[in-house]
Amino acid sequence: MILPINTYSDEVLRRKAKPLKESDAQLEELISNMLESMRNAEGIGLAAPQVGVSLRLIVVDLSLAEGYEAASPMVVINPHILSVKSFNSMEEGCLSIPDVRGDVVRPSAIQLKYRDRNFEECIGEFDRLAARVIQHEIDHLDGTLFVDRMQRRDRRKIQKELDALSRGEINTNYPVAFHEDSVVK
């Protein structure tokens, strides 16, 4: 089922998400719905708060990105970054902030502890685009948006677009939820 994606001014995007304690049929359904919703919106990452569910869960599928066509979807539960290496700046966008892009400085490689779709504990090394997308989605779990990480002068350049999003002026090819009609669990 395709879920609506919560947008910029929605309070669920500003909350710290709760850790998951176990896997169950509801979690599996949420994961499947998130993957379907992300693909429908032509995204490469989606966090549970973006679909109105305040849990520490993200899905990533880089197969739509150039050079990553063979990538498999990844489910990340209760992520914790153990270490980072070097930093670089790259333009980012977000399904919750449609048609807005901006440069963000992030570590270019991370070591991550997390649980997978089967709730097995994993430690993985990620770099380049995978590291960036995972960090972007983890930010959602902590109530941070990519625009919060932009330099002040760059953020001022997109303020009109952010104000329009706050007023509900959104044009997307995927369903969205506004703060008046979102559901937080």
From Swiss-Prot:
What keywords are annotated for this sequence in UniProt? Hydrolase, Iron, Metal-binding, Protein biosynthesis
Name the UniProt record assigns to this protein: Peptide deformylase
Q: Which residues cross the membrane?
A: none
The record's section on Gene3D superfamilies has: Peptide deformylase
What functional role does this protein have?
Removes the formyl group from the N-terminal Met of newly synthesized proteins. Requires at least a dipeptide for an efficient rate of reaction. N-terminal L-methionine is a prerequisite for activity but the enzyme has broad specificity at other positions.
Endpoints of the signal sequence: none
Quote the catalytic activity from the record: N-terminal N-formyl-L-methionyl-[peptide] + H2O = N-terminal L-methionyl-[peptide] + formate
NCBIfam families hit by this protein: pept_deformyl, PRK00150.1-3
Q: List, from the UniProt record, the residues annotated as the active site of this protein.
A: E137
